[in-house]
């Protein structure tokens, strides 16, 4: 898939308007062998879609997002999210196979209210 970052941002905007369309867009982008590695769990396919929807349903806000790298096989970005009154800087990487998201890892840390993506080295 070309322009993964653009597609990702469009998916997020769709979630605010049409949850079913959002779910369909995610599902269509996942490889049959998809795995999502979180801090404490390994999640597959529909479980990941449910996890993402639970986050949004519980008030997740993506405050800012920055593309770090993208090519045919790799998609890497950082974002600042807010949930439960706390802000987190997350690092997200996807590995693509056969034009679909095959593996995904996310890590994060809490940041202050005045932290911005511009503070990341290399910005």
What are these regions (language model features)?
Residues 1-19, 28, 100-102, 112-123:
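Terminal "cap-and-tail" regions of soluble proteins that handle hydrophobic small molecules
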Residues 2, 19-71:
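A solvent-exposed, acidic/Ser-Thr-rich amphipathic alpha-helical stretch
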Residues 4, 9, 23, 44, ...:
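Functionally constrained cores in energy, signaling, and assembly domains
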Residues 51-123:
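A beta-strand edge to alpha-helix "cap/lid" segment located at domain peripheries
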């Amino acid at each position: 898939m070309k322009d993964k970052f653009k597609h990702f941002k469009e998916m997020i905007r769709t979630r605010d308007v049409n949850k079913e369309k959002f779910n369909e867009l995610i599902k269509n982008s996942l490889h049959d062998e998809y795995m999502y590695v979180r801090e404490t769990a390994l999640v597959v396919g529909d479980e990941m879609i449910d996890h993402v929807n639970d986050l949004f349903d519980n008030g997740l806000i993506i405050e800012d997002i920055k593309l770090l790298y993208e090519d045919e096989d790799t998609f890497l970005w950082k974002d600042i999210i807010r949930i439960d009154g706390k802000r987190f800087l997350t690092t997200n990487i996807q590995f693509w196979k056969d034009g679909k998201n095959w593996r995904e890892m996310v890590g994060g840390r809490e940041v202050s209210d005045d932290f911005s993506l511009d503070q990341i080295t290399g910005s």
